[in-house]
Amino acid sequence: MQAETDHFDVVVVGAGPAGLSAALNLVRARRRVLVLDGNRPRHAATLISHGFLTRDGTPPHELRRLAREEYLAYPEAQYQLAQVRQITALAEPRDYPYQTETHTTGATGLFRVEAAGVNGKPDRTVTTQTVLIATGLREELPALPSIRSFYGMGLFSCVACDGYEYSDQPIALIGETSDVAWRALLISQWSDNLTVFTNGVDAVSEGQQALLAERGVAVDARPIADVEGGRDGVTGIRMQDGSTVAVSGGFVRPRWHAQLEFAAGLNLDADGWGLLTVDRDGRSSYAGVYAAGDITSPGPQQLIVAAGSGARVAATINRDLIGIPTARGR
């Protein structure tokens, strides 16, 4: 890890799998990198992660610890617990520095990044040629009294991550969003005993309900009172009419919120869900600003997918920095 400096090639905002994967690849390219970690991981409630090659069954917090350790082993690496408050563009993007018949590098700029220290750490203000936004998303669960207590230990949001453990069991999908029917079709490949609970919200159309019925998926639109269960997990969904539907666990579709107030001055393009719009290489609508992981479309995916996204965008950033000397002056 290098001594503290005030100027970097890349500032990475967020220290999840996307941000740390990108940071690791960038320091290996001898780029001067600062990772700013607000220490609010979306997977904080999840006890075990799945599907990460060589790390299946590893807790997400352990994956983050190992990733930080590997990143900080390089002399160009810096890491700080700090919540980014503002990113300001200080200069117009420089011209595209390199072009061939098959590849054109992106433009980079100059930015000031201001961050407030967390957990007793100091504030930090630095400048950087590029910024990678890998903040992930904030989750808003349906407003049920006990749902947060079971989240990560009986109710999950990632079907690809946790569907296997509920194979052939009676399971629930709680969701109030317009894509809940599509998610139910996906979940139905793990169990033929699935009930979709929309909590009184008209989230499933008649056509979607017919399609779900063909797959043996029930739809219960009654208002929910609460989730029932104990230390071993979820046992049922209690409705406001007093009845309970027995389940062994299941899934919830949160509403996801992109917290990008710190980048408001850059007017970054986003889709209808608030996710950042990027090109296939991770470049945002503002030259020199990139995004990776859950903050980009299609939103939350497996940890290994986010890590791969970070590695891919790191390669883009390094190419776009051609002509800017590395930490070793090359």
Give short role names for the model-derived ranges.
Residues A3, F8-L66, D179-D202:
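Beta1-alpha1 glycine-rich phosphate/pyrophosphate-binding loop at the start
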Residues A23-L24, A181-L185, A292-R330:
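A conserved FAD-binding loop/helix module that cradles the flavin
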Residues R65-T128, S191-T277, R319-R330:
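A Rossmann-like FAD-binding core segment of flavoenzymes
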